[in-house]
């Protein structure tokens, strides 16, 4: 045993108490294997065994932490990319200003009424690099919401429009609609980015965007408790998935979601013939549809 080159090398790098354990195990294994006259030396076999154990321990430690994902839907660096659709979906409650935004982002016929829409309005958005993307304005009525799962499954990004002048009164409804969008399986699995656009900033009664975010987070936190972990509407009743919004045991925050949720404000309608403050929307589309 003293002539073993392998054990002598181990003695240089390992503490004495570890070497005592190795010598003890060595003698046990050597005594056990001696009758079999194996062509492999005991110290080589012992080294191979220790190496195998070491590899298993390392793979368990780094493999489990590397593949760990938040059970609650938080972002992780090794998440598998899922191909998204190509549509830009404009969503929100009725009278939020969705159609006005569509008109000012696309080449849609300006004759389209900006009053409450009954059916979807469609157009084409042209990016800075001349890429043409379908853009869909989805009415806020219940009938249109029934077709929303299909629209979301084909979406590259979502613009959720809020009427900043009525948000305080409608905050619960806004949160309910947003909850259904964020817990939609396609939005969740494909990590479809969302921009919450606080519209009508040209009017004095518009609420501040930071307040909108804080109120929505509180409302969504309440909805998690009352509605559980499954979406209830949007045509998903027959195919419910266990999707929990945010991190369990902590107050809801948009930062806890797997997909990027941004906030911006502005006015979707032209003022004195000029369109104001929708550059954030254009930048959002540009960066999320590359």
Swiss-Prot record:
Keywords: Endoplasmic reticulum, GTP-binding, Membrane, Nucleotide-binding, Receptor, Transmembrane, Transmembrane helix. Component of the signal recognition particle (SRP) complex receptor (SR). Ensures, in conjunction with the SRP complex, the correct targeting of the nascent secretory proteins to the endoplasmic reticulum membrane system. May mediate the membrane association of SR. It holds the Pfam family SRPRB. This is Signal recognition particle receptor subunit beta. GTP binds at residues 92-100, 114-117, 140, 268. Heterodimer of an alpha and a beta chain. The chain crosses the membrane at residues 44-64. It is found in: Endoplasmic reticulum membrane. GO terms for cellular component: signal recognition particle receptor complex. One of its GO terms (biological process) is protein targeting to ER. One of its GO terms (molecular function) is GTP binding. The keyword Repressor does not apply. The gene is srprb. It comes from Dictyostelium discoideum (Social amoeba).
């Amino acid at each position: 045993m003293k002539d073993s080159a392998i054990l002598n090398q181990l003695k240089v790098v390992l503490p004495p108490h570890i070497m005592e354990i190795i010598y003890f195990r060595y003698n046990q294994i050597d005594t056990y294997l001696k009758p079999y006259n194996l062509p492999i030396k005991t110290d080589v076999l012992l080294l191979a065994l220790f190496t195998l154990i070491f590899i298993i321990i390392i793979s368990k430690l780094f493999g489990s932490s590397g593949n760990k994902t938040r059970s609650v839907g938080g972002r992780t660096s090794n998440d598998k990319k899922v191909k998204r659709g190509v549509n830009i979906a404009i969503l929100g409650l009725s009278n939020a200003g969705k159609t006005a935004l569509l008109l000012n982002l696309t080449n849609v016929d300006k004759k389209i009424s900006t009053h409450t829409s009954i059916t979807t309005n469609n157009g084409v958005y042209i990016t800075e690099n001349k890429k043409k993307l379908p853009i869909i304005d989805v009415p806020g009525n219940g009938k249109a919401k029934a077709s929303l799962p299909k629209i979301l499954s084909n979406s590259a990004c979502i613009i959720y429009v809020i009427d900043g002048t009525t948000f305080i009164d409608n905050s619960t409804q806004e949160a309910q609609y947003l909850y259904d969008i964020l817990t939609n399986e396609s939005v969740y699995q494909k990590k479809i980015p969302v921009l919450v656009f606080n519209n009508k900033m040209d009017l004095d009664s518009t609420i501040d965007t930071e307040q909108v975010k804080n109120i929505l987070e509180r409302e969504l936190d309440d909805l998690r408790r009352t509605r559980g972990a499954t979406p209830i509407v949007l045509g998903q009743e027959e195919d419910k998935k266990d999707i929990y919004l945010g991190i369990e045991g902590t107050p809801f925050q948009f930062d806890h979601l797997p997909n990027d949720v941004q906030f911006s404000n502005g006015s979707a309608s032209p003022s004195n013939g000029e369109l104001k403050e929708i550059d954030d929307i254009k930048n959002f589309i540009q960066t999320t549809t590359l």
